[in-house]
């Protein structure tokens, strides 16, 4: 009788991937990255262990929003003070803080618990083409071949 393989935290090797977000649809990029952050692309996936790899996203300012999402999709947050509801459109985020737009999209696809927050720390987003992780020798992923 075979037993199910359960990975232990000490046995996991984390890789580094780099993804160019230029002209890639936001939702398709987010689903692939969330899957890699969770470790679901590995045959040894264990749901209760942080198995995911590190993902570097460059050119976040040039991500594509389809339809009228740039003007109609609204992100809300509250300051916990009376009248403190703030709203920003996706186009506004893409213009002024493109890293935050990708982080909001990807973090929304991760589990809402301590493990999901830990997996979210493996995401590194940069608006331009430069990043500070050259020492990790990231492997380039072509997102169009994965979707």
UniProtKB/Swiss-Prot annotation:
Self-association and partners: Part of the 50S ribosomal subunit.
Record family assignment: Belongs to the universal ribosomal protein uL13 family.
CDD domains: Ribosomal_L13 (cd00392)
Top-rank taxon, per record: Bacteria
Record-linked Gene3D superfamilies: Ribosomal protein L13
Record keywords: Ribonucleoprotein, Ribosomal protein
GO MF annotations, alphabetized: mRNA binding; structural constituent of ribosome
Record's keyword annotation contains Zinc: no
InterPro entries per the UniProt record, alphabetical: Ribosomal_uL13, Ribosomal_uL13_bac-type, Ribosomal_uL13_sf
Gene Ontology terms: cellular component: cytosolic large ribosomal subunit
Protein name in UniProt: Large ribosomal subunit protein uL13
PANTHER family for this protein: LARGE RIBOSOMAL SUBUNIT PROTEIN UL13M (PTHR11545:SF2), RIBOSOMAL PROTEIN L13 (PTHR11545)
GO BP of this protein: negative regulation of translation; translation
Protein purpose: This protein is one of the early assembly proteins of the 50S ribosomal subunit, although it is not seen to bind rRNA by itself. It is important during the early stages of 50S assembly.
Coiled coil spans: none
């Amino acid at each position: 009788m075979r037993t199910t393989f359960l990975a232990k935290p000490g046995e996991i090797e984390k890789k580094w991937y780099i993804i160019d977000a230029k002209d890639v649809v936001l939702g398709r990029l987010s689903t692939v990255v969330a899957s890699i952050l969770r470790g679901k692309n590995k045959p040894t996936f264990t749901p209760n262990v942080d198995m995911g790899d590190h993902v570097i996203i460059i050119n976040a300012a040039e991500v594509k929003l389809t339809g009228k999402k740039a003007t109609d999709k609204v992100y809300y947050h509250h300051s916990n003070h009376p009248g403190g509801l703030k709203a920003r459109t996706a186009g506004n985020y893409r213009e002024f803080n493109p890293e935050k737009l990708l982080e909001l999209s990807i973090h929304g696809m991760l589990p809402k618990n301590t493990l999901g927050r830990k997996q979210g720390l493996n995401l590194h987003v940069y608006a331009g083409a430069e990043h500070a992780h050259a020492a990790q020798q990231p492997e380039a992923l072509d997102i169009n071949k994965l979707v």
